[in-house]
């Protein structure tokens, strides 16, 4: 797609001239709010309603600034710093010896982080005989979610032009193989007090969970980065509670912040994110929590609970974004 960032969303000619950008860890993914994948013969395969924050969380765990120079990240308009992101938002103006340069829109190509791009290795594609027609539904992000910066206000906006979806195919096999796909289920909640409990069920056999946070006053407002992985005010303890496959209660109370981070990294390592490391996490400005269950847990009938001891209060509530990782075989 071609990207044009605007100072006045009602006028396509008001190209941004500085002070506006999008998260360097996300690049073009920042403009996607949600992704839904549906197979006609199966139904809904995956629905990630907070997609951009998921991509950002993956990035802080698996990428450093030098990784953004690789071609597969540069083509997504990811960057080594926010100054570059502001330059992308201004458009691309060639240097000319003579004549008047014409500013062009920056273009990008992203590989969506959804189940269609997380299939088991060694399998010769996904058979249409098994899936039927495949629908990929994408909802674009609100202006104040996608953009941030000193001069971003309610009039700022963006346009995506010349959108196109490409896919690679091979002749359908007469004896299609089973395909296992990585799936993400998301859940949003909030913290309103220092002693908070969040409980949820997920229609999946979950293998791990990861979560990130942002103060409510910093989300979907001018200037602030809505995708920032913020720390939790006065975090003292996190405790995870769920029933194992043998139906015995498992409790993980964690008070050490280093262990909290290590558990988050472990929650991402076996979910098609093979580049994650604690060193890369520490090189990025962000915070997240997580837990690897060490086995697939059926959370459709088994409630997952997390308890957090913090100094959060109702005057400054915190939004919580949880991501449960599972696999589905077609």
Residue ranges and their predicted role:
Residues 1-330:
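Short, low-complexity Pro/Thr/Gly
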